[in-house]
Amino acid sequence: PEKLLKSLVENLRWGRIEIDLIEMHGPTLGAIDDRLMALELVKADLSRAVLFNLDGKVVIPADTFYRKRVLAMRGKFYAVEQGDIDLFMHAKSRFQKESKASDSEVLSLTELTMAQMANDKSIDTSDFLARANRLSDAGFHVLISGFFRHFRVSQYLSGNTREPVAIVT
């Protein structure tokens, strides 16, 4: 996967290309997991973030966030704990009340960042994928990003929806 990504940006300066989604289909590409490829995009700075839906599939963030109020919770999520879920649900009910939104109008999102490991070239994408799977199973969309600071996450989310955005920490 890493060699394939490097070949996509060969002879291009950094910042000239951003890839939102990559899917692999075909007889020789069947063994490549699209979800791991998506994480490699973030790791290689070819994408600012990738989004997994409730089924654990990679989706285009702008399409998913369209006309949705977004409530995001940042964390490491090595384990999905009931306390985190309770905190998020309390924040969601408050967010719905303040923004006068129904449950279907609010997208529940968890965000994991690879930025804290930016200096570590050996980022374990399979660990991030396992955490994303656990969070998807718990009923959350999962955004895995390269954002170090909270305001960057907020800017990214606000750039993909015109509706209100809130972050739970």
Give the positions of each predicted feature.
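Nucleotidyltransferase catalytic core that binds NTPs
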Residues: 1-169
